């Protein structure tokens, strides 16, 4: 699930899901992981991260996305300080951090694989990373996709399978 509280959940998905400050603790009684999509848009305050760490058992895992400034604005270049800041902010989660997701824009294509390789090489080796690509060439079963997979293998990074071809089959309604 992409969040641990939702306005439609009380008395539905969780039979006795109250609106409260301990929603994460209640969520963690039913699920053992959560994707924190919000870190793509903004970074949480340190006190919130500490509260999250204290709200779940040791076997619970958080998955967070790298911030969009890292992935979309800088496209993985010249963002060492932002990466360090985000990883430092999540330090209170320690062993509860499951995966850091690297969601790349469709404009990040095969010509930028060397940038991805350098970025992954600079990350702490103990960090579990998953990469989501959206450029169509990475789904064409050709040399570009093979090259991407080789980069991921070399850096022990996972690949998120989000085949975007269906998103691009209809007309653009910008």
For the regions a protein language model found, what residue spans apply to each?
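Residues lining hydrophobic/aromatic ligand-binding pockets adjacent to catalytic sites
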Residues: 1-174
């Amino acid at each position: 699930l992409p969040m641990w509280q939702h306005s439609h959940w009380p008395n539905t998905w969780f039979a006795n899901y109250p609106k409260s400050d301990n929603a994460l603790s209640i969520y963690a009684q039913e699920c053992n992981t959560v994707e924190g999509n919000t870190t793509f848009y903004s970074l949480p305050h340190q006190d919130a991260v500490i509260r999250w760490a204290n709200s779940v058992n040791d076997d619970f895992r958080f998955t967070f996305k790298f911030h969009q400034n890292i992935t979309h604005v800088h496209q993985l270049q010249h963002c060492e300080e932002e990466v360090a800041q985000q990883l430092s902010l999540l330090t209170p989660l320690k062993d509860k951090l499951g995966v850091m997701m690297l969601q790349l824009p469709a404009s990040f294509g095969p010509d930028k694989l060397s940038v991805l390789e350098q970025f992954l090489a600079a990350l702490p080796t103990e960090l579990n990373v998953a990469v989501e690509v959206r450029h169509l060439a990475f789904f064409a079963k050709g040399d570009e996709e093979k090259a991407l997979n080789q980069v991921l293998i070399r850096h022990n990074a996972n690949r998120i399978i989000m085949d975007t071809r269906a998103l691009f089959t209809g007309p653009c309604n910008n």
